Amino acid sequence: MRKRIGILTSGGDCPGLNCVIRAVVSHATLTYDWEVLGIPYATQGLRERQAIALNMHGWDLRGIDPLLNMGGTILGTINKGDTLAHVDEMLASYQALALDALIVIGGDGSLGILHELASRGNWNLVAIPKTIDNDVALTERAVGFDTAVNTIVDALNRLTFTAASHDRVMIVEVMGRSAGHLALHAGIAGGADVILIPEISYTISGLCQHIAELRDRWQRKFAIVVVAEGAKLCLEDVQENIASSCAPSKCGRGQYIADQIAQCSKNLIDTRVSVLGHIQRGGIPSALDRLTATVFGKTAVDLIAQGKFGQMVAWQNGEAIPVPIQDVVAQSPLHVNPQGSLVQSARCLGIYVGEKT
């Protein structure tokens, strides 16, 4: 009997989602002659029983080709709302759509919610990791991360020249509330002088001392500071600055650091803040993200054909392999290892990455 599978994108968007959709539709159609339904706007579309036949109505194999270099997701996505408040509706929708299996492309939050729904409804679920934060456990790589790193590095390349021209300290705030993979990778690749991440606490004195040393010892009158939005102060500094008019929670991590540098230097150091924001989520997917998305999409279809459900496609040791979704959810988010090779490499290059423990 011909299978009917569904596919949805959930959570924040990122480059490479359309590449996954392209791979799933192409492989499912060419190899297995399955029907593929795209479910718009994640669990909202599932609850409302919306579905788009991706191998019909203009989405033939020739028409899918442009998806390879298209950012965002043609299916739309949401990252808000209380999904579990509509459990019964969504459980009924899976049956009403007559799905034999569902492919979910999401981050750790989405995977947790969809895994819970699948467990309650006995769905046949296969997951694909996507996140610019790269914080999904048990996989070395997630769709969207590489492009986001490249986007930040491009911004750092541009900002370095304007910082040098004006002898400024440029603070670049990037995404990463609980994990600093994005800031760490982009900061090292982009030649940052300071990288602040959630996993390693920093002090105002340590930060200011490092910038002063760049000027006094190395005659570097400019500096590039990359800070994750979830970077954490040491406890002593938190207590001292809790009443500050520009605490991180009030005006943003980047602006807070700029104000502290100005205060330490008695306003002798000129600072500027650049919050990259959602530009990190956009753009044409990189070659690596296209390859990752394609292999992940193909592997997800094969897992369905093999009857291997409750699995997420992961990248480990150069191969795409299945790992149990429940293990991924239990071990996520994946944090930066403070003693890992990336942190140690950054420190050996003279980059301030917070205080050593």
Swiss-Prot record:
GO cellular component: 6-phosphofructokinase complex
PROSITE patterns: PHOSPHOFRUCTOKINASE
EC number: 2.7.1.11
GO molecular function, one term: metal ion binding
Pathway the protein takes part in: Carbohydrate degradation; glycolysis; D-glyceraldehyde 3-phosphate and glycerone phosphate from D-glucose: step 3/4
Pfam families according to UniProt: PFK
Site entry: Important for substrate specificity: 109
UniProt KW rRNA processing keyword: no
InterPro entries registered for this protein in UniProt: ATP_PFK, ATP_PFK_prok-type, Phosphofructokinase_CS, Phosphofructokinase_dom, Phosphofructokinase_III, PKF_sf
Positions annotated as active site in the UniProt record: 133 (proton acceptor)
Regulation: Subject to allosteric activation by ADP and other diphosphonucleosides, and inhibition by phosphoenolpyruvate.
Protein localization: Cytoplasm
Function: Catalyzes the phosphorylation of D-fructose 6-phosphate to fructose 1,6-bisphosphate by ATP, the first committing step of glycolysis.
Record-given protein name: ATP-dependent 6-phosphofructokinase 2
Species: Nostoc sp. (strain PCC 7120 / SAG 25.82 / UTEX 2576)
Gene name of the record: pfkA2
